[in-house]
Curated annotation (Swiss-Prot):
Cytoplasmic side: 1-22, 86-93, 139-159, 214-277, 350-354, 411-424, 472-508
A GO BP entry: phosphate ion transport
Function: High-affinity transporter for external inorganic phosphate.
Family, per entry: Belongs to the major facilitator superfamily. Phosphate:H(+) symporter (TC 2.A.1.9) family.
Organism: Oryza sativa subsp. japonica (Rice)
Cellular component GO terms held in the UniProt record: membrane
This protein's UniProt keywords: Membrane, Phosphate transport, Symport, Transmembrane, Transmembrane helix, Transport
Full protein name: Putative inorganic phosphate transporter 1-13
InterPro entries: MFS_dom (IPR020846), MFS_sugar_transport-like (IPR005828), MFS_trans_sf (IPR036259)
Protein encoded by which gene: PHT1-13
Length: 508
């Protein structure tokens, strides 16, 4: 009975009608992902400029890998540490720290200076980009967990996907800002190019900084307060404010629930209940990030090889022209492929289901990458570079309307509240290890692009197989998925707690 009484307050959250606050939360939580995606692509542009300014041509291969991959190295400890802190200290208490660190690191990256030019400046830049990666990594489990615990069960997938879709806007913004800055400096003296890369890097901090105040005002999620902190009064107060529903708390119910299901991470009971789930989320995220990040980071190498981009030389104006061309191609792929993929996931994830979309995504990525790899010599021989770009864009469409989004959604739903942020952090950290493998493991891709594509196809097939370990979470309450509390057995599934209705009491 206690479980049913407690679940009434969570049931009210599960069936709540979509309100303005949900959309505000999407924007607040999504700004970290805007900066993440902005940084991912903009650093590829910046690498060309750094090569021209400090190496009079192209960055050495090892330095290029360090500049582009060091932030990914920072995301691994960021996800593990902040994911764990999110469960131990509360989602809100550490949420502002990640955003503040993100803003400071972005600005400091653009302000990197040294007494001696060249390698010293690169070292300073890498230092601040590592901490930028830590902040971005910490934002993953916290944003996903907060959005999953705020949302109703009917549209929960769409809300989490919408937060993640801010990556698409960050990706697009990187291309647009890159084109604007490149065009602005095109007719300036060569010495002023040093300002261009700094402006590009620092711009990503602006949207995140604008949402810091609102992030600090967000209340702790009711699920954390009720199920982990066992503070029924505060949970009732916070939920009343969010849903415009008056809730009467009962501390005795919370105390009784506090003694239920207290198994720890990696205990026998956890492995029995969720071991295969964690294996599925980690492996799928790992192989997805090997593919997704390597295709992003090495896009310019691949496009140069097929003739879409001019090759680098020591001429200043050629460097900027290459940047303009690169950003134009990337913006085209974002608008026609990547961004629509995010939108399709938001629209269909609560209709089709997370697992089906992930399976479809891995399958179609494999198909289009086979279309790139098998006739690769034909793409080169016939100079069909625009057809190659279309196939490349379709690969990104099904990555985003597929595992790139669903690997972010699923870990935020299928683990118990007291371990949710930690497990999401573990899944994401393993994923980012895959991203590091993708960046540092394919340093010579321009010489073996066909082999590179076939390796990524193998990663897609592994992801498809391990997706079969994951449960479908569409339309289910978080507590039903995790088994924390017995399923609430009322017949009013179709009822809604609406913002416009009079305030009433839901017993706790």
């Amino acid at each position: 009975m206690a479980g049913n009484q407690q679940l009434r307050v969570l049931h009210a959250l599960d069936i709540a009608r979509t309100q303005l606050y949900h959309f505000i939360a999407i924007v607040i939580a999504g700004m970290g992902f805007f900066t993440d995606a902005y940084d991912l692509f903009s650093i590829s542009l910046v690498a060309d400029l750094l090569g021209h300014v400090y190496y009079h041509g192209e960055l050495p291969r090892n330095i290029h890998a360090a500049v582009t991959g060091i932030a990914l190295c920072g995301t691994v400890p960021g996800q593990l540490v902040f994911g764990w802190l999110g469960d131990k200290m509360g989602r809100k208490r550490v949420y502002g720290i990640t955003l503040l660190l993100m803003v400071v690191s972005s600005l400091a990256s653009g302000l990197s200076f040294s007494k001696h030019e060249g390698m010293n400046i690169i070292a300073v830049l890498c230092f601040f980009r590592f901490w930028l990666g830590v902040s971005i990594g910490g934002d993953y489990p916290l944003s996903a967990t907060i959005m999953s615990e705020y949302a109703n069960k009917r549209t929960r997938g769409a809300f989490i996907a919408a937060v993640f879709a801010m990556q698409g806007f960050g990706n697009l913004a990187a291309g647009i800002i890159g084109m604007i800055v490149s065009a602005a400096f095109k007719h300036s003296s060569a010495s002023k190019i040093d300002y261009a890369w700094r402006i590009i890097l620092m711009f990503g901090a602006i949207p995140a900084a604008l949402t810091y105040h609102w992030r600090m005002k967000m209340p702790e999620t009711a699920r954390y307060t009720a199920l982990i902190s066992k503070n029924a009064k505060k949970a009732a107060k916070d939920m009343s404010a969010v849903l415009n529903v008056n809730i009467t708390p009962d501390d005795e119910v919370i105390n009784e629930l506090a003694r239920q299901d207290e198994y720890g991470l990696f205990s026998f009971e956890f492995l029995h209940r969720h071991g295969l789930h964690l294996l599925g989320t980690t492996v799928c995220w790992f192989v997805l990030d090997v593919t997704f990040y390597s295709l992003n980071i090495f896009m310019k190498n691949i496009f140069t090889e097929v003739g879409l981009l001019p090759r680098l030389d020591s001429e200043y104006h050629h460097t900027l022209q290459r940047m303009i061309t690169m950003t134009a191609v990337h913006t085209f792929i974002s608008l026609c492929g990547a961004l629509p993929g995010y939108f399709f996931t938001v629209a269909f994830v609560d209709r089709i289901g997370r697992v089906k979309i992930q399976l479809i995504g891995f399958t179609m990525m494999t198909v289009f990458m086979l279309c790139l790899a098998i006739p690769y010599d034909q793409w080169l021989r016939h100079k069909n570079k625009y057809g190659f770009a279309v196939m490349y864009g379709l690969t990104f469409f099904f990555a985003n309307f597929g595992p790139n989004t669903t690997t972010f959604i699923i870990p935020a739903e299928i683990f118990p509240a007291r371990l949710r942020s930690t497990c999401h952090g573990i899944s994401g950290a393993v994923g980012k290890i895959g991203a590091i493998v993708g960046v540092f493991g394919f340093l010579y891709t321009e010489y073996h692009i066909r082999i590179f594509l076939f390796v990524l196809i193998g990663c897609n097939l592994v992801g498809f197989i391990f997706t079969l370990l994951l449960p479908e979470s569409k339309g289910k309450s978080l507590e039903d998925l995790t088994g924390e509390i017995e399923e609430f057995q009322e017949e009013d599934e179709g009822s809604e707690v609406a913002l416009s209705r009079p305030i009433h009491t839901v017993p706790l």
